[in-house]
Amino acid sequence: MMARRDPTSWAKRLVRAQTLQKQRRAPVGPRAPPPDEEDPRLKCKNCGAFGHTARSTRCPMKCWKAALVPATLGKKEGKENLKPWKPRVEANPGPLNKDKGEKEERPRQQDPQRKALLHMFSGKPPEKPLPNGKGSTEPSDYLRVASGPMPVHTTSKRPRLDPVLADRSATEMSGRGSVLASLSPLRKASLSSSSSLGPKERQTGAAADMPQPAVRHQGREPLLVVKPTHSRPEGDCREVPQAASKTHGLLQAARPQAQDKRPAVTSQPCPPAATHSLGLGSNLSFGPGAKRPAQAPIQACLNFPKKPRLGPFQIPESAIQGGELGAPENLQPPPAATELGPSTSPQMGRRTPAQVPSVDRQPPHSRPCLPTAQACTMSHHPAASHDGAQPLRVLFRRLENGRWSSSLLAAPSFHSPEKPGAFLAQSPHVSEKSEAPCVRVPPSVLYEDLQVSSSSEDSDSDLE
């Protein structure tokens, strides 16, 4: 009996075992985990939940089919305000609505009273209301309607002043010229002040303290003469006409002399860029001793040249007394730097002792705008040797600060041989200086010192 088995029963058992294995491998729905797998001390590293590890089949990161979708909780109507605003019943208005209604009723009651008062004072008929029921008057209309005469505003038309007062104001404004000013404002102010004022007004209307610039337009040599009347006498200001050229432009400032002991030096203007083609020259005198400019109109040039030079006919004038600081070093420098051509000899022969020119090599520390140490451009060709005339003698002196000063000494005779002692008789101090004992210096050393002093003057003027 035991040896014989039923083949059908064996086959049935095999089919049942296979079906059970299939069911275990592929579960249809979520199954409850066994109690031994739940351990609250374990934490899954994949999902971060407690009760299972990363190897467990309960982890939703491994079996997405078994993951449960989180169900939404029930709605709580008590905490959510579905109707945030409810209209209040007009029968029972709140306290805020009462105050608001009273404020709206008060201006409506005051409107007819206000309109009646405005009609009485202004005399205008009351305005008709618009058909839509809105009044045309605004709350601020009662401020616009005035009970008295309204002021007349004349902003477009300005009152015309008396021509005398206008000319005086224009003259005063022209006296207060700025440091950097152009040509047109100065010419307009000067022309208006010179043409509109009468003979009586020129005597009484002009300001005594402010100098009046006058522009002359007669002839081919327009000049600008500025006479400061409050700091120096009229005799100190010299008016020497000079030819207008393209190399010399318009208008340099006139600075009044602060120390009357030192002589006046006439400086040449520097050419501005805007007025180069006009060719207007200026003849201005100033005092070199002032450290601060006085309250006088100052007209400075727009473009300062690095090294302004003078022509042979434009030699700066100054007294010889300014060079008496040291002993004479050399009475006859090299002919290339000291001799004048035949064109300049007649002019130098007619000069008086007070008009003997001298060039100061000291840098102008107190004059930042107008450099007074200007070298005299002389002829570098010794043309006086073949004409038979004696060369011009220049006296060079070494100052205390190591700089040089040169002064021109006229020869005994240039073109007037019939009067050989006329000039020496008039200028005895010049002959005394020439006869004084002097120390001979080689021409090359003297020329190098002059070049060093001129370069230092350029650097000082640029720094100032």
From Swiss-Prot:
Highest taxon of the lineage: Eukaryota
Chain positions covered by the region annotation Disordered: 1-42, 70-389, 411-437
Comp. bias intervals (Low complexity): 180-197
Cross-referenced InterPro entries: FAM90, Znf-CCHC_6
Biased composition regions of type Basic and acidic residues, renumbered to the chain: 74-89, 97-114
Protein family: Belongs to the FAM90 family.
The protein, known as: Protein FAM90A14
Organism in which the protein naturally occurs: Homo sapiens
